[in-house]
Amino acid sequence: MAKNRKTPDMNLPMWFDGQNINEALFCEEFLHERRIIFANGAFFTPDGRVTDDLPLRGEIYDKLKFCAVNNIPRKITNILEVLKLEAQVPDFPPEQDRIHLSNGTLLLDGTFTKGRPAIVRSRLPVAYNPNAPAPEIWQNFLDGLLHAEDIPTLQEFIGYCLIPSNKGQRMMVIKGNGGEGKSQIGAVLSTIFGTNMKDGSIGKISENRFARADLEHILLCVDDDMRMEALRQTNYVKS
């Protein structure tokens, strides 16, 4: 029997009186059971920013489905709106001294802590393995694509993108002929960064001030097919 399923003695959850759902009380109970906050226009959990609310809606539905109420989809939407208010925190600053990974957290001083106890702004979908062998396939690929002196620069730039900081004020442009394999760098980065990376257009960002909103909470933006003409303005890109 489900945890909150109605029983003959009417032991109902405190947020359901048998006919109506109290959304505020539901959210209070939900937050006692689930580690989640709302900040800067997004939900965050120990897995990082919630980019798809369908699983969250599914969790809410599992708790509501025993209730004989009308229009459960609308009720779930209303609960999500109340949850934003109930779970809101005034400030959730980025942590620039650590990288959250699928199996723990790596500090920039080399210290690694296993587990995912804290709510974080971002978590990369890759595991930390201090004994991992050298990535020979990746190194051979870079050897065939770049000059030897350029490889450390690329590696350093990728490492810089792992932390939520723009203090370096740098953008990397990889220039070359078509068919050389440059796009494979973006494919590898997509695997490392997951939803923390966005495929975008530098031209669109430079021309549309609203395009920057798509980059909020994003660690890396990759333009895989940058236009050759000069940018009309660079104010939005620099900011």
What are these regions (language model features)?
Residues 14-15, 67-70, 146-150:
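Short, polar/flexible loop-turn hinges at active-site or ligand-entry regions and domain interfaces
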Residues 31-56, 95, 99-100, 105-220:
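P-loop NTPase catalytic core of nucleic-acid-dependent motor ATPases
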Residues 211-239:
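Conserved nucleotide-sensing/catalytic segment adjacent to the nucleotide-binding pocket
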Residues 20-25, 190-195, 230-239:
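A short, contiguous, amphipathic alpha-helix enriched in charged residues
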Residues 74, 184, 231-235:
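Charged, alpha-helix-enriched surfaces in structured cytosolic catalytic cores
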Residues 1-10, 42-74:
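Short, small/acidic-rich helices and loops at N termini and domain boundaries
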Residues 15-35, 129:
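Intein-associated homing endonuclease modules of the LAGLIDADG/DOD-type, together
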